[in-house]
Amino acid sequence: MEASNKLAVLLLWLVMAAATAVHPSYSENSPQDYLTPQNSARAAVGVGPVTWSTKLQQFAEKYAAQRAGDCRLQHSGGPYGENIFWGSAGFDWKAVDAVRSWVDEKQWYNYATNSCAAGKVCGHYTQVVWRATTSIGCARVVCRDNRGVFIICNYEPRGNIAGMKPY
């Protein structure tokens, strides 16, 4: 193959690779990106779906904005159930990453004893699948000074009530 043909093939390959690359978009943090995986986890244990609440979204946005300065993994202390997530700088963490981390805690939850495995956390998972919860609202903020990403979801009614099973 001539050098000019090799160059043309290489350029065509580069153009096609660039055209098919996945580019992040705002749609990767839409309400549906929070709802779909949480509702899938709920359906897996026979619990009905949750719906999006703009009231909870606004609460989450306000608190996420407060965390943008330090990106500390600290709960709001608000009146709703709450799951929070922090992802380190250098990766464009999305809604699906936060929800996956919460749902992955299922492996540590023992329904029979209504407890987490020793030394493990599973309260984020139990909040996701809490039967009484009917609505959620979430927010995501990129923290200042390259400190990572903070993601929060609020739940109403709140879950994780002591002594009660989630479903």
UniProtKB/Swiss-Prot annotation:
Residue intervals of the SCP domain: 37-155
Keyword Disulfide bond: yes
Induction note: By fungal infection in germinating seeds.
Residues spanning the signal sequence: 1-27
Gene3D superfamilies documented for this protein: CAP
One cellular component (GO) term of this entry: extracellular space
Keywords annotated in UniProt: Disulfide bond, Pathogenesis-related protein, Plant defense, Signal
Membrane-spanning ranges: none
One record GO biological process: sexual reproduction
Record-linked SMART domains: SCP
Disulfide bridge positions per record: 71-143, 116-122, 138-153
A Pfam entry, by short name: CAP
Function noted in UniProt: Probably involved in the defense reaction of plants against pathogens.
Family membership noted in the UniProt record: Belongs to the CRISP family.
Name the UniProt record assigns to this protein: Pathogenesis-related protein PRMS
Gene expressing this chain: PRMS
